[in-house]
Regions:
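Substrate-binding/catalytic lobe of Class I Rossmann-like enzymes that use SAM or dcSAM, i.e.
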Residues: 203-287, 291, 295-304
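Conserved beta-strand signature within the Rossmann-like core of class I S-adenosyl-L-methionine
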Residues: 182-200
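Conserved SAM/SAH-binding beta-strand->alpha-helix loop
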Residues: 112-116
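Conserved class I S-adenosyl-L-methionine
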Residues: 79-88
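Conserved SAM-binding loop of SAM-dependent methyltransferases across substrates and taxa
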Residues: 89-104
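A short, conserved alpha-helix within the catalytic core of class I
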Residues: 166-180
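N-terminal auxiliary segments of SAM/dcSAM-dependent transferases
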Residues: 1-37, 44
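Class I SAM-dependent methyltransferase Rossmann-like catalytic core
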Residues: 11, 30-80
Length: 324
C-alpha cells in the first residue's frame, strides 16, 4: 500500500486545546498566545508572503543552503525513510525526494502535521510525482505526538527545518530533542535541523517588522483566529504590532500592544479579559542559536553534531545530527 494516514488529533481535540491555551495564556502575566494559532488559512497565506520579503532571510537562506549541501549529503547518506516534522505542504522536501528517489529507488516519506487536509493534498501530489514513493502521514502535534511516528523501514533521515525549534522555550527545546532522538533508533540514522543564528540586531528586527507591514498583519491575524475559535470580540485595529530582539535571552519577541484600555469578551470560555493602555500579548518567541549552544542542547539529549553547514553570511545553519 503506497498511502497510509494515522490520525492522532482531530477538530474536537484541537478545539479543546485551543480553549485551554487561550484561557491559560490570557489569564497569565504577561498575557500570551501560542504562535501555532497564527496559521489559519489567512495566516498561512500571509506567512507565504513573509517568506518572499527582502527583509525575511530565513526561508531563502535555508533553501539555498539545502540545495548546496544535498549532493554531498545524499552521496554519504542515502536514506530509505524520510520523516518531516511540521511538514505542511512538503515543499521543502521535494529537493530531497528528487535526490533519494532517483532511478526509481523505493523510499517511504512520513510527514507529520496538525492539518489533515494539507497532508492529504500533499500526499496526493507527491505520490503522483514520485512513482517509487510511499507515504505514511501522521496527523498530530509535534510537541505531543512524535511517539506515533511509525518505526523506520531502513536508514532514516528525520528533518525539522525552518528553525521552528526556535519557537519553543529552552525546556521545550530539550524535551523535543529527546523525543527526536527516539526517532533515530539506528546509529546510522540522522536528523537534519534548521537553526537561525545570532546576528546583527538590525537584520533580526527587520525580518520580523518588515517595511510593507506583512508581519504586522500576520501578527494581528491571531486575534481573528481567537475570535472565531472562542467567540471573542477582539478588535485587531485596537492593537499594534511590536517586534524586538531580547539580547539577554537571544530571541526575537513579537507582541500585540493595546493602544488604549480594552475589555475583551471570550464568550465560549465565559471569560472577560481587560487590557491597560500599552499592555501586550506575547505572541511569539524566535530563539537564535550559536553552534556552541546547539551542541550543548544536543549533548543534554544524548545527541551529537555530525556536520554543521552555514551559509556564507553566517545567517543560518543546517545541523546534521546523530545519536551520541
Amino acid at each position: 500500500m503506497r498511502y497510509l494516514i494515522d490520525v492522532h488529533t482531530d477538530e474536537r481535540a484541537q478545539q479543546q486545546r485551543l480553549e485551554e491555551d487561550v484561557r491559560r495564556g490570557l489569564t497569565s502575566r504577561p498575557k500570551s498566545l501560542p504562535p501555532k494559532y497564527f496559521y489559519d488559512r489567512a495566516g498561512s497565506l500571509l506567512f507565504e508572503r513573509i517568506t518572499e520579503l527582502p527583509e525575511y532571510y530565513p526561508t531563502r537562506t535555508e533553501s539555498a543552503l539545502l540545495a548546496e549541501i544535498l549532493p554531498g549529503l545524499i552521496e554519504d547518506f542515502l536514506p530509505d525513510d524520510i520523516v518531516e516534522i511540521g511538514a505542511g505542504s512538503s515543499e521543502k522536501t521535494r529537493r530531497v525526494l528528487d535526490a533519494v528517489t532517483a532511478g526509481g529507488r523505493p523510499v517511504r516519506y512520513v510527514p507529520l502535521d496538525v492539518d489533515r487536509l494539507t497532508l492529504e493534498a500533499s500526499a496526493e501530489r507527491l505520490l503522483r510525482e514520485y512513482p517509487s514513493l510511499s507515504v505514511h502521514a501522521v496527523v498530530g502535534d509535534f510537541e505531543r505526538d512524535l511517539a506515533h511516528v511509525p518505526p523506520p523501514t531502513g536508514r532514516r533521515l528525520a528533518m525539522f527545518l525552518g528553525s521552528t525549534i526556535g519557537n519553543l522555550d529552552e525546556p521545550a527545546q530539550r524535551r523535543l530533542l529527546a523525543d527526536l532522538k527516539a526517532l533515530l533508533p539506528d546509529p546510522r540514522d540522522r536528523l537534519l535541523l534548521g537553526v537561525d543564528l545570532v546576528k546583527d540586531v538590525k537584520i533580526l528586527e527587520a525580518a520580523y517588522d518588515d517595511s510593507a507591514g506583512v508581519t504586522r498583519d500576520f501578527n494581528l491575524n491571531i486575534l481573528r483566529v481567537i475570535n472565531r475559535g472562542v467567540d471573542g470580540d477582539f478588535d485587531p485595529d485596537a492593537f499594534r504590532h511590536r517586534a524586538f530582539y531580547n539580547d539577554a535571552a537571544a530571541r526575537i519577541e513579537m507582541h500585540l500592544v493595546a493602544e488604549s484600555a480594552q475589555t475583551v469578551r471570550l464568550r465560549r470560555l465565559g471569560l472577560t479579559v481587560r487590557f491597560a493602555p500599552g499592555e501586550g500579548i506575547w505572541t511569539e518567541s524566535s530563539y537564535k542559536f550559536s553552534r556552541a549552544g546547539i551542541e550543548a542542547l544536543l549533548g543534554d539529549a544524548g545527541l551529537r553534531l555530525a556536520r554543521w553547514h552555514v551559509d556564507p553570511a553566517n545567517y543560518f545553519a543546517l545541523a546534521l545530527i546523530q545519536r551520541a
